[in-house]
Curated annotation (Swiss-Prot):
It is an enzyme of class 6 (ligase). Transmembrane segments: none annotated. Signal peptide: none annotated. InterPro entries: Class_I_gatase-like, CTP_synthase, CTP_synthase_N, GATASE, GATase1_CTP_Synthase, P-loop_NTPase. The gene is pyrG. UTP binds at residues 12, 180-185, 216. Residues 290-523 form the Glutamine amidotransferase type-1 domain. Residues 1-259 are annotated as: Amidoligase domain. It catalyses: UTP + L-glutamine + ATP + H2O = CTP + L-glutamate + ADP + phosphate + 2 H(+); L-glutamine + H2O = L-glutamate + NH4(+); UTP + NH4(+) + ATP = CTP + ADP + phosphate + 2 H(+). L-glutamine binds at residues 53, 343, 371-374, 394, 451. This is CTP synthase.
């Protein structure tokens, strides 16, 4: 078994997850069976209850696990489905150890960080990596953080039983035009003080590292120059595997592991070329409540990148604060499409309802996801059914028209963590609908994360107003997809299609939105050139 451990130094946010994902892609396409493991040192059991402002998007796996957004990167780059076992947190480790202690598994021993916590960490790593040739382990946080210490010690101990390559992500800042190596030197020194000497350094910088800088880093860190990889800024993360490949990272790893008989099958050439040189572009508004931290919507951003890579249509995202739409819809005036993503809590909901109405009334291509699906129902109920004050019981428990209501099985749930309708669920698609044309299938499986649904008492009235519920759950009780009978560019889904979008297999509904946005843009151009203003 081969392990590649990725740690980070100097500062957080250097892109360990993207580097890990890119290296995984190269190794997988060289013929290795590869998996990724993310270690998150926080005491939370999982990411499910974390504020997106602090932690970014909560990513949902097929098995319903709510995990760090880096696992979304892993799935996209590896084109695979991971499980909750691929995300190790301090909360999971301590919960397991304490439960075992209460059960008497330690036979009266004093339970300590070493060996009991570190052994639990190693057991979980081995469980998640079983059956693979190489497992890449990303240790969250920065070397030296007190929360990370047990995990650093655990991955250090791996070397006694398995082949381990230690890699370290550092920062090489540029000051007055000179690339500075001191932060990297000190970060490696800190890592060594914990018993780990890195074999590879991934050096983040604005521009490619100069040869003299690489030689200097090599001299002071004892990492060979061939193991120092310049990770400079690029336009799109899907260009990174090619940058690594050009610097010989695969040859270095193959030599280190003694597996030199694999040849790379680089499948992204056309995909990356379309991202670099798109033929056309569209402007799409994402109307959200967490737009100050765009990582809260990273899977939507990546889904649009996947569409670009497959079509050559670039997506210029306009980040629109939902609350600002309460005063003016000016930010929606010149866009070719509108996406209303998921979210929780009342703040921003009325702005999202305004966005849904603006798209419907102006026939602008629209995609609603999760809450974006629910606000479409609320908006149509208010505007077309005349149900003034129609709402979701999530936001107004006393509304006269609860067109969105809590799932029956959720009504007595008190805990927030891991209790929603989560994970991959079957969706049945009706014939003769836009959804059927998009998916070309009667059955799909998509990931969910919600507590509320369309109230069955209002379905018939909504359908009479022109709503088509073109997708349902397998019992045909829960509504999953909404479209309108008088157009083909308005669709909303209860599920999160963005979570299953992949570079070479983009989300079908994101693809549909972009294609309809381009059609809308071309129509506007034709009208303008004919003397009709937008």
């Amino acid at each position: 078994m081969h392990y590649i451990v990725i740690t980070g130094g100097v500062i957080s946010g250097l892109g360990k997850g993207t580097i890990t994902s890119s290296l995984s892609y190269l190794l997988k396409n060289s013929g290795f069976k590869v998996t990724n493991i993310k270690i998150d040192p926080y005491i939370n059991y999982d990411a499910g209850t974390m504020n997106p402002y602090q932690h970014g998007e909560v990513f949902v796996l097929d098995d319903g696990s709510e995990v760090d957004l880096d696992l979304g990167n892993y799935e996209r780059f590896l084109d695979t489905d991971l499980t909750g076992n691929n995300n190790i947190t301090t909360g999971k480790i301590y919960k397991s150890v304490i439960e075992r202690e209460r059960h008497g598994d330690y036979l009266g021993k004093t339970v300590q960080i070493i060996p009991h916590i570190t052994n639990e960490i190693k057991e979980r790593i081995k469980r998640a990596s079983s059956g693979y040739d190489i497992a890449l382990i990303e240790v969250g946080g920065t070397v030296g953080d007190i929360e990370s210490m047990p995990f650093i010690e655990a991955v250090r101990q791996l070397r006694s039983t398995d082949d381990v390559i230690y890699s370290h992500v550092t920062l090489v800042p540029e000051i007055n035009g000179e690339q500075k190596t001191k932060p990297t030197q000190h970060s490696v020194k800190e890592l060594r003080s914990l018993g780990i000497s890195p074999d590879i350094l991934f050096c983040r910088s604005e521009k490619p590292l100069g040869k003299d800088v690489i030689e200097k880093i090599s001299l002071f860190t004892d990492v060979p120059a061939s193991g120092i990889i310049s990770m400079y800024n690029v336009k799109n993360v899907y260009m990174i595997p090619e940058i690594m490949m050009r610097q010989g990272i695969l040859e270095y790893i193959k030599k280190r592991t003694g597996t030199s008989n694999h040849n790379l099958d680089y499948t992204w050439s056309n995909f990356v070329e379309n991202i670099k040189n798109p033929a056309e572009s569209v402007d799409i508004a994402i109307v959200g409540k967490y737009i100050e931290l765009q990582d809260a919507y990273i899977s939507h951003k990546e889904a649009f990148s996947h569409v670009t890579g497959n079509t050559g249509i670039s997506v210029n995202i306009h980040w629109v604060d939902a609350d600002k739409l309460l005063n003016s819809t000016h930010d929606l005036k010149n866009v070719d499409g509108i996406l209303v993503p998921g979210g929780f809590g009342y703040r921003g909901v009325e702005g999202k309802i305004i966005a849904a109405r603006y798209a419907r009334e102006n026939r602008i291509p629209y995609l609603g996801i999760c809450l974006g699906f629910q606000v479409s129902v609320i908006e149509i109920s208010r505007s077309l059914l005349g149900l003034k004050g129609a709402n979701s019981t999530e936001f107004d428990n006393n509304t006269d028209y609860p067109v969105i209501d809590i799932l029956p099985e959720q009504s007595n749930v008190s805990d927030l963590g891991g209790t929603m309708r989560l994970g991959s669920k079957k969706v049945l698609i009706k014939d003769g609908t836009i959804a059927k044309n998009i998916y070309k299938s009667d059955i799909i499986y998509e990931r969910h994360r919600h507590r509320y649904e369309v109230n069955p008492d209002y379905i018939e009235r909504l359908e009479d107003s022109g709503v088509i519920f073109s997708g349902t759950d397998d019992e045909k009780i829960r509504m999953e997809i909404l479209e309108l009978s008088d157009r083909d560019n308005y669709i909303a889904t209860q599920y999160h299609a963005e979570f299953k979008s992949r570079p070479l297999n983009p989300s079908k509904v994101h693809m549909h939105l972009v294609l309809k946005a381009l059609e809308y843009r071309r129509n506007i151009y034709e009208r303008n050139t004919s003397g009709i203003s937008r």
